[in-house]
Amino acid sequence: MPHKQVVIIGGGFGGLTAAQSLRDADVVLIDRTNHHLFQPLLYQVATSALSPGDIAWPLRTIFRRYPHVRVVMDEVLSIDRTARVVQLRDSRPIPFDILIMAPGSRHSYFGRDAWEESAPGLKPSTVRPGWRRASRPTSSSSRRCWT
């Protein structure tokens, strides 16, 4: 009996765990980035205790010992559940027998969207710009603010 074709959308904890567990399937893991970010340690990058490379690992390196897993770096445009195909931005459509959705999470402000400005959270989209600004202060007063 041929192996099932499993497509996993998302290279976070859920996607990694599913891909590593499904040894009797042909797995295609799709993510927009080529790395897994260990988000519980983002605060240590934000405080300069760790560098970004210490908490981000290439997905292909993680799955080097898993020959049943193929990693595709692309953006999912649509999912045709009837035809069982995932449409991607830059790659050919990928057929599936089983689809696992593990795209990650977003912050919830429980209907109080104004809170986002004061409490942006420690996601890469909020940490990186602050780190870049801090690494290139333009004046001595802003330099003091970041140190």
Show which residues each predicted segment covers:
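FAD-binding core/adjacent interface of flavoenzyme oxidoreductases
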Residues: 1-3, 69-147
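Beta1-alpha1 glycine-rich phosphate/pyrophosphate-binding loop at the start
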Residues: 1-70
